[in-house]
């Protein structure tokens, strides 16, 4: 297909609270080099898609407070390709905003939608996979998501059950989706993996812009009606007023729950490249390849570790000696103004840090 009709939407609106205290409201994780690669998450994502989508067809959707950070980190981004959300309303409104914007430019648009915080370990294979998926949706009115063969019963990811029985892991062609399950508990995740029918849901989607518009109007009319007329407001003096009003009245809902779980157009493309959704400290620990013999992962200047296993130690400033003794499956996260010592289990951490919402901790958020 003609790549001039291929677009990419990078969703970069999250606040990254599960990566606190390194990720803060003023500069969340998508704008940080949490994985110590030399590039921020959003920079890596942008560069990854340059291999398959024309530069002028890459759009970024983020909170309006992050305008300057995005333009600083992605200076090649055309200003009109930065879509600013006045409020966070989850992925369905974000996708509606981008879809209506793209359709005004190009009614023939084919779109890949991606989060901004993924780790991919084979950029060439990734580009080939996206290109193949674009080719597949060209001849089919389907909504495609990329599925990843699970390597562990991870409770931080959603799961997709593919049609095709217990041999689906051998398949390298798109498959119709049977069920979606959002973040099961560990026991259920183990059952899923044992069946050989389930994949991790990568959260990367591909579709024709016109097809997702029609499907969202069918299943999420309360969202899409907020953006009707956007094509007339775009580029005019009422543009900001229109979007503020749309987001004020818009329902907070994900595209998975609002559309993908309901439509019979959901298909999954199994991928072979290495993938990680770095949404939590626990997920970062899981993808770090360099661990010591006791399973400790360290990103710090100097450490003294004894009688300790399965621990993640992170000190972004790398100015201190971090000494750890007698811990198991913990994380030690040290910044200039906050020190966190906590079990690295994501659910426990999320409950624990809810306390930073108290007024006396405002400056640390």
What are these language model-derived features?
Residues 42, 98, 117, 160, ...:
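Residue-level signal for inorganic ion chemistry
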Residues 111, 204-205, 276, 331:
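A residue-level structural signature of the nucleotidyltransferase/glycosyltransferase Rossmann-like core
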Residues 2-5, 210-365:
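Left-handed beta-helix
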Residues 60, 83-84, 113, 146, ...:
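General beta-strand structural signal in soluble alpha/beta enzymes
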């Amino acid at each position: 297909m003609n790549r001039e009709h291929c677009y990419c939407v990078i969703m970069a609106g999250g606040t990254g609270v599960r990566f606190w205290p390194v990720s803060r409201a003023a500069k969340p994780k998508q704008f940080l080099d949490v994985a110590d690669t030399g590039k921020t998450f959003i920079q890596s994502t942008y560069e990854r898609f340059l291999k398959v989508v024309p530069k002028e067809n890459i759009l970024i959707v983020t909170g309006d407070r992050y305008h300057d950070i995005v333009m600083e980190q992605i200076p090649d981004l055309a200003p009109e390709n930065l879509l600013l959300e006045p409020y966070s309303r989850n992925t369905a409104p974000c996708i509606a905003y981008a879809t209506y914007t793209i359709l005004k430019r190009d009614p023939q648009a084919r779109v890949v939608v991606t989060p901004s915080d993924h780790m991919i370990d084979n950029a060439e294979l990734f580009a080939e996979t996206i290109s193949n998926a674009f080719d597949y949706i060209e001849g089919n009115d389907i909504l495609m998501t990329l599925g990843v063969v699970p390597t562990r019963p991870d409770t931080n990811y959603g799961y997709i059950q593919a049609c095709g029985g217990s041999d689906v892991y051998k398949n390298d062609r798109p498959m119709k989706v049977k069920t979606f399950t959002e973040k099961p508990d560990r026991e259920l995740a183990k059952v899923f993996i044992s069946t050989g029918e389930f994949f991790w849901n990568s959260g990367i989607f591909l579709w024709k812009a016109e097809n997702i518009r029609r499907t969202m109007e069918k299943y999420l009319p309360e969202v899409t009606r907020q953006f009707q007329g956007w094509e007339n407001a775009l580029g005019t003096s009422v543009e900001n007023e229109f979007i503020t009003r749309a987001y004020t009245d818009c329902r907070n809902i994900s595209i998975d729950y609002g559309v993908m779980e309901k439509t019979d157009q959901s298909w999954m493309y199994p991928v072979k490249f290495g993938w990680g959704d770095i949404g939590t400290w626990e997920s970062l620990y899981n993808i770090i390849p360099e661990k010591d013999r006791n399973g400790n992962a360290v990103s710090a200047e100097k450490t003294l570790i004894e009688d300790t296993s399965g621990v993640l130690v992170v000190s972004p400033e790398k100015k201190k000696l971090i000494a750890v003794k007698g811990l198991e499956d913990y994380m030690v996260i040290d910044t200039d103004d906050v020190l966190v010592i906590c079990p690295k289990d994501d659910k426990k951490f999320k409950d624990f840090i809810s306390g930073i919402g108290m007024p006396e901790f405002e400056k640390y958020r």
